Amino acid sequence: MRQASVLAPHTNGPTVTAGEILVEIMATTVGDGFLEPQTLIGPFPSGAPAIFIDQVARCGGTAGIIAAVGDDDFGRLNIERLRRDGVDVSAITTIADRPTGSAFVRYRENGARDFVFNIAHSAASETRMTDEAQALIEKAGHVHIMGSAFAIAGIGAIILEAVKSVKARGGSVSFDPNIRKELAQGDEGRRLIDDLLAVTDLLLPSGEELQAASGLDDEEAAIEKLLAAGIGEIVLKRGANGASHFSRAHGRIDAPGLEVEEIDPTGAGDCFGATYLTCRRLGMRPGKALVYANASGAHNVTKRGPMEGAASLAELDAFMAAQLSEEVL
Protein backbone atom coordinates (compact mmCIF):
# COMPACT_ATOMS: atom_id res chain seq x y z
CA MET A 1 0.00 0.00 0.00
CA ARG A 2 1.56 3.29 -1.08
CA GLN A 3 1.59 6.42 1.06
CA ALA A 4 -0.93 9.16 0.30
CA SER A 5 0.46 11.14 -2.62
CA VAL A 6 0.69 14.88 -3.23
CA LEU A 7 0.49 17.11 -6.28
CA ALA A 8 3.75 18.40 -7.72
CA PRO A 9 4.03 22.21 -7.49
CA HIS A 10 4.00 24.23 -10.71
CA THR A 11 7.74 24.79 -10.39
CA ASN A 12 8.28 21.10 -11.25
CA GLY A 13 7.19 21.73 -14.82
CA PRO A 14 4.08 22.12 -16.98
CA THR A 15 0.86 20.13 -16.88
CA VAL A 16 0.72 17.90 -19.95
CA THR A 17 -2.11 15.85 -21.44
CA ALA A 18 -2.73 13.83 -24.59
CA GLY A 19 -5.89 13.15 -26.52
CA GLU A 20 -8.37 14.21 -29.12
CA ILE A 21 -8.75 17.67 -30.62
CA LEU A 22 -11.91 18.33 -32.60
CA VAL A 23 -14.43 20.97 -33.56
CA GLU A 24 -17.98 21.14 -32.28
CA ILE A 25 -20.82 22.27 -34.52
CA MET A 26 -24.14 22.88 -32.82
CA ALA A 27 -27.73 22.92 -33.99
CA THR A 28 -29.49 26.18 -33.19
CA THR A 29 -32.86 24.49 -32.70
CA VAL A 30 -34.06 21.97 -30.14
CA GLY A 31 -35.22 18.64 -31.52
CA ASP A 32 -34.42 15.04 -32.32
CA GLY A 33 -31.19 14.47 -34.21
CA PHE A 34 -30.09 15.50 -37.69
CA LEU A 35 -32.66 13.86 -39.95
CA GLU A 36 -33.62 17.09 -41.69
CA PRO A 37 -31.82 20.24 -42.92
CA GLN A 38 -31.32 22.74 -40.10
CA THR A 39 -29.34 25.77 -39.03
CA LEU A 40 -25.99 25.11 -37.39
CA ILE A 41 -23.48 27.29 -35.53
CA GLY A 42 -19.75 26.71 -35.27
CA PRO A 43 -17.12 25.43 -35.65
CA PHE A 44 -15.98 25.77 -32.03
CA PRO A 45 -12.62 24.42 -30.77
CA SER A 46 -13.24 21.32 -28.67
CA GLY A 47 -12.11 17.92 -27.42
CA ALA A 48 -12.01 17.18 -23.68
CA PRO A 49 -8.18 17.19 -23.41
CA ALA A 50 -8.00 20.43 -25.40
CA ILE A 51 -10.65 22.15 -23.26
CA PHE A 52 -8.87 20.98 -20.12
CA ILE A 53 -5.41 22.14 -21.13
CA ASP A 54 -6.70 25.48 -22.42
CA GLN A 55 -8.25 26.17 -19.02
CA VAL A 56 -5.00 25.21 -17.26
CA ALA A 57 -3.24 27.92 -19.25
CA ARG A 58 -6.04 30.44 -18.70
CA CYS A 59 -5.68 29.90 -14.94
CA GLY A 60 -1.99 30.77 -15.06
CA GLY A 61 -0.48 27.31 -15.25
CA THR A 62 2.11 26.20 -17.79
CA ALA A 63 0.53 23.66 -20.11
CA GLY A 64 1.08 21.50 -23.18
CA ILE A 65 -0.81 18.92 -25.21
CA ILE A 66 0.13 15.94 -27.38
CA ALA A 67 -2.41 15.56 -30.17
CA ALA A 68 -2.99 15.46 -33.93
CA VAL A 69 -5.17 17.53 -36.25
CA GLY A 70 -5.81 17.59 -39.98
CA ASP A 71 -4.27 20.02 -42.44
CA ASP A 72 -7.48 22.04 -42.49
CA ASP A 73 -9.15 25.08 -40.99
CA PHE A 74 -10.68 23.02 -38.18
CA GLY A 75 -7.21 22.02 -37.06
CA ARG A 76 -5.81 25.51 -37.48
CA LEU A 77 -8.55 27.19 -35.44
CA ASN A 78 -7.85 24.79 -32.55
CA ILE A 79 -4.10 25.32 -32.66
CA GLU A 80 -4.48 29.09 -32.82
CA ARG A 81 -6.93 29.16 -29.88
CA LEU A 82 -4.65 27.02 -27.73
CA ARG A 83 -1.56 29.03 -28.69
CA ARG A 84 -3.34 32.32 -28.02
CA ASP A 85 -4.32 31.16 -24.55
CA GLY A 86 -0.77 30.13 -23.68
CA VAL A 87 -0.69 26.38 -24.34
CA ASP A 88 2.49 24.78 -25.71
CA VAL A 89 1.30 23.43 -29.08
CA SER A 90 4.68 22.13 -30.26
CA ALA A 91 3.56 18.49 -29.87
CA ILE A 92 0.41 18.86 -31.99
CA THR A 93 1.06 17.01 -35.26
CA THR A 94 -0.65 17.96 -38.52
CA ILE A 95 -1.76 14.90 -40.51
CA ALA A 96 -2.05 15.60 -44.24
CA ASP A 97 -4.50 12.87 -45.23
CA ARG A 98 -6.90 12.84 -42.26
CA PRO A 99 -9.46 15.51 -41.29
CA THR A 100 -9.61 17.11 -37.88
CA GLY A 101 -12.17 15.37 -35.68
CA SER A 102 -15.68 16.77 -35.41
CA ALA A 103 -18.81 16.52 -33.29
CA PHE A 104 -22.26 17.69 -34.35
CA VAL A 105 -24.54 18.31 -31.37
CA ARG A 106 -28.26 18.92 -31.00
CA TYR A 107 -30.29 19.27 -27.83
CA ARG A 108 -33.56 17.43 -27.28
CA GLU A 109 -36.55 18.89 -25.46
CA ASN A 110 -35.65 16.93 -22.30
CA GLY A 111 -32.11 18.34 -22.19
CA ALA A 112 -30.43 15.22 -23.57
CA ARG A 113 -28.12 15.59 -26.56
CA ASP A 114 -27.73 13.83 -29.91
CA PHE A 115 -24.16 13.57 -31.23
CA VAL A 116 -22.66 12.68 -34.59
CA PHE A 117 -18.92 12.11 -34.06
CA ASN A 118 -15.99 11.69 -36.41
CA ILE A 119 -13.07 10.85 -34.13
CA ALA A 120 -12.04 7.24 -34.81
CA HIS A 121 -11.26 8.00 -38.48
CA SER A 122 -9.95 11.52 -37.91
CA ALA A 123 -6.42 12.84 -37.45
CA ALA A 124 -6.76 12.09 -33.72
CA SER A 125 -6.39 8.38 -34.50
CA GLU A 126 -2.92 9.11 -35.92
CA THR A 127 -1.55 10.64 -32.70
CA ARG A 128 1.96 9.26 -32.20
CA MET A 129 5.00 9.69 -29.94
CA THR A 130 7.02 12.25 -31.91
CA ASP A 131 10.29 13.94 -30.96
CA GLU A 132 8.26 17.00 -29.98
CA ALA A 133 5.97 14.92 -27.78
CA GLN A 134 8.95 13.30 -26.10
CA ALA A 135 10.51 16.70 -25.44
CA LEU A 136 7.28 17.97 -23.88
CA ILE A 137 7.03 14.92 -21.63
CA GLU A 138 10.64 15.27 -20.51
CA LYS A 139 10.00 18.74 -19.09
CA ALA A 140 6.54 18.01 -17.63
CA GLY A 141 5.85 18.13 -13.91
CA HIS A 142 2.33 16.72 -14.07
CA VAL A 143 0.30 14.48 -16.39
CA HIS A 144 -3.48 14.68 -16.68
CA ILE A 145 -5.23 11.52 -17.86
CA MET A 146 -8.58 11.54 -19.65
CA GLY A 147 -10.12 8.09 -19.38
CA SER A 148 -11.88 8.55 -22.72
CA ALA A 149 -8.53 8.97 -24.49
CA PHE A 150 -7.88 5.23 -24.18
CA ALA A 151 -10.65 4.64 -26.71
CA ILE A 152 -8.46 6.21 -29.43
CA ALA A 153 -5.71 4.08 -30.94
CA GLY A 154 -2.20 5.06 -29.88
CA ILE A 155 -3.03 7.69 -27.30
CA GLY A 156 -3.14 5.33 -24.33
CA ALA A 157 0.45 4.22 -24.92
CA ILE A 158 1.60 7.86 -25.03
CA ILE A 159 -0.17 8.62 -21.76
CA LEU A 160 1.33 5.62 -20.01
CA GLU A 161 4.82 6.56 -21.21
CA ALA A 162 4.29 10.13 -19.99
CA VAL A 163 3.14 8.91 -16.58
CA LYS A 164 6.18 6.65 -16.23
CA SER A 165 8.57 9.46 -17.15
CA VAL A 166 6.99 12.15 -14.98
CA LYS A 167 6.55 9.92 -11.94
CA ALA A 168 10.21 8.89 -12.12
CA ARG A 169 11.15 12.58 -11.74
CA GLY A 170 8.89 13.20 -8.76
CA GLY A 171 5.96 14.57 -10.75
CA SER A 172 2.27 13.86 -10.21
CA VAL A 173 -0.80 12.55 -12.03
CA SER A 174 -4.47 13.50 -12.15
CA PHE A 175 -7.13 11.21 -13.58
CA ASP A 176 -10.59 12.09 -14.88
CA PRO A 177 -12.19 8.64 -15.24
CA ASN A 178 -14.78 9.79 -17.77
CA ILE A 179 -15.77 6.22 -18.50
CA ARG A 180 -19.08 4.41 -18.30
CA LYS A 181 -19.56 1.96 -15.45
CA GLU A 182 -20.12 -1.01 -17.77
CA LEU A 183 -16.73 -0.47 -19.44
CA ALA A 184 -15.02 -1.04 -16.10
CA GLN A 185 -16.67 -4.42 -15.61
CA GLY A 186 -14.59 -6.31 -18.19
CA ASP A 187 -11.26 -7.79 -17.08
CA GLU A 188 -9.12 -5.67 -19.41
CA GLY A 189 -10.93 -2.43 -18.60
CA ARG A 190 -10.77 -3.15 -14.88
CA ARG A 191 -7.02 -3.82 -15.03
CA LEU A 192 -6.40 -0.57 -16.89
CA ILE A 193 -8.40 1.44 -14.37
CA ASP A 194 -6.61 -0.20 -11.45
CA ASP A 195 -3.21 0.49 -13.04
CA LEU A 196 -4.13 4.15 -13.52
CA LEU A 197 -5.49 4.51 -10.00
CA ALA A 198 -2.22 3.10 -8.65
CA VAL A 199 -0.36 6.16 -9.98
CA THR A 200 -3.10 8.77 -9.43
CA ASP A 201 -2.52 11.66 -7.03
CA LEU A 202 -5.76 13.54 -7.82
CA LEU A 203 -8.95 11.75 -8.89
CA LEU A 204 -11.73 13.83 -10.50
CA PRO A 205 -14.83 11.63 -10.85
CA SER A 206 -18.53 12.29 -11.12
CA GLY A 207 -20.95 10.03 -9.21
CA GLU A 208 -21.13 7.13 -11.68
CA GLU A 209 -17.41 7.42 -12.41
CA LEU A 210 -16.68 7.12 -8.69
CA GLN A 211 -18.58 3.83 -8.70
CA ALA A 212 -16.70 2.64 -11.79
CA ALA A 213 -13.33 3.55 -10.28
CA SER A 214 -13.95 1.96 -6.89
CA GLY A 215 -16.23 -0.92 -7.81
CA LEU A 216 -18.55 0.18 -4.97
CA ASP A 217 -21.98 1.82 -5.11
CA ASP A 218 -21.85 3.50 -1.69
CA GLU A 219 -20.18 6.92 -1.92
CA GLU A 220 -18.59 6.90 1.54
CA ALA A 221 -17.21 3.39 1.12
CA ALA A 222 -15.92 4.20 -2.36
CA ILE A 223 -14.08 7.30 -1.13
CA GLU A 224 -12.53 5.41 1.78
CA LYS A 225 -11.35 2.58 -0.46
CA LEU A 226 -9.63 4.96 -2.88
CA LEU A 227 -8.00 7.07 -0.17
CA ALA A 228 -6.79 3.90 1.56
CA ALA A 229 -5.16 2.89 -1.73
CA GLY A 230 -2.97 6.00 -1.58
CA ILE A 231 -4.76 8.55 -3.76
CA GLY A 232 -3.95 11.92 -2.22
CA GLU A 233 -7.08 13.87 -3.18
CA ILE A 234 -10.49 13.00 -4.56
CA VAL A 235 -12.70 15.77 -5.88
CA LEU A 236 -16.23 14.57 -6.60
CA LYS A 237 -18.08 16.61 -9.22
CA ARG A 238 -21.77 17.08 -8.44
CA GLY A 239 -22.78 19.31 -11.36
CA ALA A 240 -25.15 22.11 -10.38
CA ASN A 241 -24.92 20.91 -6.75
CA GLY A 242 -21.24 21.85 -6.51
CA ALA A 243 -18.42 19.52 -5.51
CA SER A 244 -16.73 17.80 -2.59
CA HIS A 245 -13.06 17.37 -1.72
CA PHE A 246 -11.83 14.33 0.22
CA SER A 247 -8.31 13.74 1.54
CA ARG A 248 -6.49 12.46 4.61
CA ALA A 249 -4.81 15.84 5.07
CA HIS A 250 -7.90 18.07 4.85
CA GLY A 251 -10.85 15.74 5.40
CA ARG A 252 -14.09 16.51 3.59
CA ILE A 253 -14.80 19.95 2.14
CA ASP A 254 -18.09 20.71 0.38
CA ALA A 255 -18.64 23.70 -1.89
CA PRO A 256 -22.07 24.61 -3.29
CA GLY A 257 -22.68 25.22 -6.97
CA LEU A 258 -23.56 28.58 -8.48
CA GLU A 259 -27.03 29.20 -9.89
CA VAL A 260 -26.65 30.16 -13.56
CA GLU A 261 -28.61 29.86 -16.79
CA GLU A 262 -27.23 26.84 -18.63
CA ILE A 263 -26.56 27.46 -22.31
CA ASP A 264 -24.14 24.64 -23.14
CA PRO A 265 -22.80 22.15 -20.55
CA THR A 266 -20.13 20.62 -22.80
CA GLY A 267 -16.68 21.17 -21.30
CA ALA A 268 -17.85 22.27 -17.85
CA GLY A 269 -16.31 19.27 -16.11
CA ASP A 270 -13.05 19.74 -17.99
CA CYS A 271 -12.85 23.41 -16.97
CA PHE A 272 -13.70 22.45 -13.38
CA GLY A 273 -10.93 19.86 -13.18
CA ALA A 274 -8.35 22.07 -14.87
CA THR A 275 -9.08 24.95 -12.53
CA TYR A 276 -8.91 22.84 -9.39
CA LEU A 277 -5.67 21.15 -10.44
CA THR A 278 -3.98 24.39 -11.46
CA CYS A 279 -5.00 26.22 -8.30
CA ARG A 280 -3.61 23.39 -6.20
CA ARG A 281 -0.35 23.25 -8.18
CA LEU A 282 -0.03 27.02 -7.70
CA GLY A 283 -0.22 26.49 -3.93
CA MET A 284 -3.87 27.26 -3.19
CA ARG A 285 -5.58 25.36 -0.35
CA PRO A 286 -8.26 22.82 -1.32
CA GLY A 287 -11.26 24.83 -0.11
CA LYS A 288 -10.36 27.90 -2.13
CA ALA A 289 -9.41 25.81 -5.16
CA LEU A 290 -12.82 24.14 -4.96
CA VAL A 291 -14.59 27.51 -5.00
CA TYR A 292 -12.70 28.56 -8.13
CA ALA A 293 -13.35 25.19 -9.76
CA ASN A 294 -17.09 25.46 -9.15
CA ALA A 295 -17.07 28.98 -10.57
CA SER A 296 -15.15 27.76 -13.61
CA GLY A 297 -17.65 25.02 -14.38
CA ALA A 298 -20.59 27.39 -13.87
CA HIS A 299 -19.02 30.08 -16.04
CA ASN A 300 -18.41 27.59 -18.82
CA VAL A 301 -22.05 26.51 -19.11
CA THR A 302 -23.16 30.12 -19.67
CA LYS A 303 -21.39 30.26 -23.06
CA ARG A 304 -22.22 28.54 -26.32
CA GLY A 305 -19.26 26.44 -27.39
CA PRO A 306 -17.27 24.07 -25.16
CA MET A 307 -14.13 26.21 -24.91
CA GLU A 308 -15.80 29.63 -25.06
CA GLY A 309 -16.33 29.71 -21.29
CA ALA A 310 -12.67 29.16 -20.37
CA ALA A 311 -11.65 31.95 -17.99
CA SER A 312 -8.74 33.34 -15.99
CA LEU A 313 -8.84 33.48 -12.20
CA ALA A 314 -9.39 37.25 -12.41
CA GLU A 315 -12.35 36.69 -14.72
CA LEU A 316 -13.72 34.09 -12.32
CA ASP A 317 -13.36 36.57 -9.45
CA ALA A 318 -15.46 39.06 -11.43
CA PHE A 319 -17.98 36.34 -12.32
CA MET A 320 -18.40 35.31 -8.67
CA ALA A 321 -18.73 38.94 -7.58
CA ALA A 322 -21.46 39.48 -10.16
CA GLN A 323 -23.26 36.35 -8.96
CA LEU A 324 -23.12 37.60 -5.37
CA SER A 325 -24.48 40.98 -6.41
CA GLU A 326 -27.42 39.33 -8.17
CA GLU A 327 -28.19 37.26 -5.07
CA VAL A 328 -28.14 40.36 -2.86
CA LEU A 329 -30.44 42.21 -5.23
Swiss-Prot record:
CDD domains per the UniProt record, alphabetical: KdgK
Disulfide cross-links: none
Catalytic activity: keto-D-tagatose + ATP = keto-D-tagatose 6-phosphate + ADP + H(+)
Record-listed E.C. numbers: 2.7.1.101
Matches recorded under Pfam families: PfkB
GO biological process: galactitol metabolic process
Disruption phenotype: Deletion of the gene does not result in growth defects for either D-galactitol or D-altritol.
Pathway membership: Carbohydrate metabolism
Key word Phosphoprotein present: no
This protein's UniProt keywords: ATP-binding, Carbohydrate metabolism, Kinase, Nucleotide-binding, Transferase
Key word Membrane present: no
Induction annotation: Up-regulated by growth on D-altritol or galactitol.
MF terms in GO: ATP binding; tagatose kinase activity
Enzyme class label: transferase
Family statement drawn from the similarity comment of this UniProt entry: Belongs to the carbohydrate kinase PfkB family.
Annotated function: Involved in galactitol and D-altritol catabolism. Catalyzes the phosphorylation of D-tagatose to D-tagatose 6-phosphate.
PANTHER family assigned to the protein according to its UniProt record, in alphabetical order: HEXOKINASE FAMILY MEMBER, PSEUDOURIDINE KINASE-RELATED
Stated name of the protein: Tagatose kinase
